[in-house]
Amino acid sequence: MSQSTLVIIGAGGIGEAIARRVGPGKEVLLGDWSNALLQEATQRMKRDGFRVTSQHVNISSHDSVIQFAEKAQSLGQVMHVVISAGLSPVSSTRETILAVNLAGTGFCIAEFGKLIGHGGTCVVISSLAGYTLAQDVPHGVIQHLARTSPSDVLGLPLLRETVLDQWSAYGVSKRVNYVQVQDASLSWARRGARINSISPGAIQTPMLSLESQASKEEVVHDLAQNVPCKRVGDSGEVAHVAAFLLGSESSFVTGTDILVDGGALAYLSRDTSS
């Protein structure tokens, strides 16, 4: 068995970047719902010398997540987990976004929390949208959604009343992720493990390209021109932060969210009254 296994759930731009940054010397398990994307990422990493295994996973299915976790455990002691699977409001419906980003993330946190090794770490990739698209939703509502079983949350009348379209579904699900991580940090700590989240802003990935093309290009351009860093980020910059959170240097950091947004939240929260 391999001494240390790195699990990447979501093999897209950010997921693969983290796998490459953290994966050397580890057994890497890649998972994604898209077989084509999964195969391409696996082949690229194998060509570059990584030890990679892949398996299809649909995180909106609890059974699929359980099977994926069993596969991870068969490869060796799971020490690092990255949950980067998620759907964009541009290409997905309200229902599918909630099933993946909200319930699916909950399934992953719960199942890998049962087998993570002592000293292990997890990073959930959330989004700046959790701060900007759900700011009007009462925190008590967010807490209730986060603390309802992933198997039951999609049927809550409160969810239907709160989330009216795919954009609010995206923002609410990402804000719920913060509370899911905070709550999980307590149970993970009992196993000697840590869990945190990262909220990227505008990062140059295929998902951002889709959002730019779907009548949101002016928003992305505005952010790139006006945020303090004056540009969009790249997936490697998110991977560097993930490496910190997954490593021993962050041993006193758990249950928190780190923004990697080039200062976008500061820009969006600025005082415009003067």
From Swiss-Prot:
The active site is at Y170, K174. Coiled coil: none annotated. Its EC number is 1.-.-.-. Keywords: NADP, Oxidoreductase. It comes from the Eukaryota. NADP(+) binds at I14, Y170, K174, I203, T205. One of its GO terms (molecular function) is oxidoreductase activity. CDD domains: SDR_c. It holds the Pfam family adh_short. Pathway: Mycotoxin biosynthesis. SUPFAM superfamilies: NAD(P)-binding Rossmann-fold domains. Short-chain dehydrogenase/reductase; part of the gene cluster that mediates the biosynthesis of the diterpene glucoside brassicicene C. In the first step of the brassicicene C biosynthesis, the bifunctional diterpene synthase bsc8 that possesses both prenyl transferase and terpene cyclase activity, converts isopentenyl diphosphate and dimethylallyl diphosphate into geranylgeranyl diphosphate (GGDP) that is further converted into fusicocca-2,10(14)-diene, the first precursor for brassicicene C. Belongs to the short-chain dehydrogenases/reductases (SDR) family. This is Short-chain dehydrogenase/reductase bsc3. It comes from Alternaria brassicicola. The lineage of its organism: Eukaryota, Fungi, Dikarya, Ascomycota, Pezizomycotina. The gene is bsc3.
